[in-house]
């Protein structure tokens, strides 16, 4: 409402709307504030101008691409939920073993889901982008990013993934954002993507 609230003569701090950024995570950074092994972390390499943030999910140390960052833990948890329905899209470069061959038909089987070491993955979608010699480029889309899911799916197909890049998370795409750069998403855009009820609950300002 814009009213000023005083308690014992002190101005109460107004609730801050959650903020959200796109970040182009480089390969070789751990998605953690601290790493027991002393490896470089995402949060130690962010611009000093950023406030304290948490990540929306994680990317493996050898995975590059889009990582969403937010000042609000509740927003992060909401966006991580598979029930949100947002697709995570990856571009994968992998090497085919001497006895393996990948076709679109074999990739279409991922739509039914699969189990690896007792863990259920999918259903997921994968498209064969191109092949060059024993290398293959795939586009994989999933609604839930379990630990090392893309690499484990690739291994199940007889592939050895050697490059993994997340190109989008829900409606937010990596685009031409440079490696290591951050770009804040406007409040209006966040509100439009989350919908009115969720936005109001999380304190997003439209």
Report residues per predicted region.
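Basic, flexible Lys/Arg- and Gly-enriched helix-loop patches that mediate nucleic-acid binding at interfaces
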Residues: 1-206
């Amino acid at each position: 409402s814009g009213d000023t609230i005083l308690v014992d003569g002190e101005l109460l701090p107004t609730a801050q709307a959650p903020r959200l950024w796109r970040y182009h995570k480089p390969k070789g950074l751990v998605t953690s504030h601290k790493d027991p092994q002393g490896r470089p972390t995402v949060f130690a390499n962010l611009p000093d101008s950023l406030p304290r943030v948490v990540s929306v999910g994680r990317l493996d140390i050898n995975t590059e691409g889009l990582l969403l960052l937010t000042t609000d833990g509740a927003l992060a948890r909401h966006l991580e939920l598979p029930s949100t329905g947002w697709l995570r899209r990856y571009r994968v470069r992998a090497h085919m073993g001497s006895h393996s061959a990948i076709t679109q038909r074999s990739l279409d089987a991922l739509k039914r889901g699969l189990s690896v070491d007792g863990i259920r993955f999918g259903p997921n979608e994968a498209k064969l982008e191109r092949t060059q010699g024993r290398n293959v480029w795939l586009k994989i889309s999933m609604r839930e990013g379990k630990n090392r899911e893309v690499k484990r799916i690739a291994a199940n197909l007889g592939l050895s993934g050697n490059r993994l890049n997340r190109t989008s998370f829900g409606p937010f795409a990596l685009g031409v954002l440079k490696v290591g750069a951050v770009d804040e998403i406007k409040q209006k855009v966040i509100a439009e993507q989350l919908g009115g009820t969720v936005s109001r609950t999380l304190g997003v300002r439209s």
